[in-house]
Amino acid sequence: MRRAAGMEDYSAEEEESWYDHQDLEQDLHLAAELGKTLLERNKELEESLQQMYSTNEEQVHEIEYLTKQLDTLRLVNEQHAKVYEQLDLTARDLELTNQRLVMESKAAQQKIHGLTETIERLQSQVEELQAQVEQLRGLEQLRIRREKRERRRTIHTFPCLKELCTSSRCEDAFRLHSSSLELGPRPLEQENERLQTLVGVLRSQVSQERQRKERAEREYTVVLQEYTELERQLCEMEGCRLRVQELEAELLELQQMKQAKTYLLAREEHLAEALLAPLTQAPEADDPQPGSGDDSNAQDGVSSPAASPSHAVRKSCSDTALNAIVAKDPASRHAGNLTLHANSVRRRGMSILREVDEQYHALLEKYEELLSKCRQHGAGVRHAGVQTSRPISRDSSWRDLLGGEESPGEGKAGEKSLSQHVEAVDKRLEQSQPEYKALFKEIFARIQKTKADINATKVKTHSSK
């Protein structure tokens, strides 16, 4: 029986040896091309990962530079705070000096008012004294005239008295009497002169007080100018402090973005390895097993139709995963790009942060190009898988080995059922959400939440100020 079975197998092998050899050569060529393309793609992915690592290192250096700048800004902020304290103390001293000068100015004004009142009162007293002196002079002249008139009368009435009056002694006595009468009003003139000198002294004091008042007003204007300058410097210090707070918030946001990006790169690397593992293992599954004796060709011929559906399923799984990578959460990725663009427009003043933002956008573009290349490569691999599976499924040799002769309608029905099975597996894989997609959604949700919290804190600080 064994010999008969061996003879039948040998006859079948002689009849269809060139078919199996041609199919195996075609499969080997396709597997070699597939392995070559996969190796080239692996090298390209490694080069892109090296570029990403170098970009990541550059961004780490930039973040270190930004931290150093932040430290310097903090030192400058501390120095500004010290200067602000000194300015505050100087402003307080100037306010006290200003108040003291205002009090002195008020006291000087009151003193000037009192001195003007005293001068007016003294002037009125001088005028009254001058009027009294004029009255006394008038009365004295009237009295002298009356005495002369009476003397003349007595002289005319008594001729003996006329001789006495005309004598030298009488004239000397009359002169002495007149001089005594003239010396009488001299104290009033001295008082008048004293009052006039006092008025001159008071006027000089008033002029000095006016000069002091003008000097105090000039000092007051200088103090006001210094106070306005200090207020302006204080406003500039507040602006610097707010700018430092904004830079700290931006640095914190950049650090969060760096952490998220490194996490995404690590996840992408593991995901690329996981996706490329079944593709690199595919040629090993298609190779014939050496050392299987005379039954190796027959076993390969029988197992090839069974292996082709699983191979197609494996390739469709990888294609579905690549499509899921490219189409992962487009809404959240678009929202993240819009948020980054808005942040870059809002912070157009800082060149360093704008360069970091541009580099991050360039990195995102490289990442999308890499995903598109992976998708194209996956499409090429799927096309190659279809080319390798269709000749095997269309070949009638394995149908003859399995069950004799079959009609062309039954072959088409088997091929249709196989394609329906592959499509069902693809749909089931597309419906099941992969793990990395949920992880990316969670990462972008966390980033948007932190941005919302930072914006809320900024709004609270601005409202409190």
Swiss-Prot record:
UniProt entry keywords in alphabetical sequence: Coiled coil, Phosphoprotein
Q: Which residues form a coiled coil?
A: 31-64, 91-142, 188-266, 350-377
Has the keyword Aminoacyl-tRNA synthetase been applied to this entry? no
The Phosphoserine modification is found at S308, S318, S344, S407
Q: Which organism is it from?
A: Mus musculus (Mouse)
Q: Which one of the record's GO molecular function terms can you name?
A: identical protein binding
Which InterPro entries does the protein's record reference?
A: CDR2
Which PANTHER family is this protein grouped with?
Answer: CENTROCORTIN FAMILY MEMBER, CEREBELLAR DEGENERATION-RELATED PROTEIN 2-LIKE
Protein name listed in UniProt: Cerebellar degeneration-related protein 2-like
Which family does the entry's similarity section mention? Belongs to the CDR2 family.
Q: Where is this region: Disordered?
A: 282-315, 382-421
State the taxonomy lineage.
Eukaryota, Metazoa, Chordata, Craniata, Vertebrata
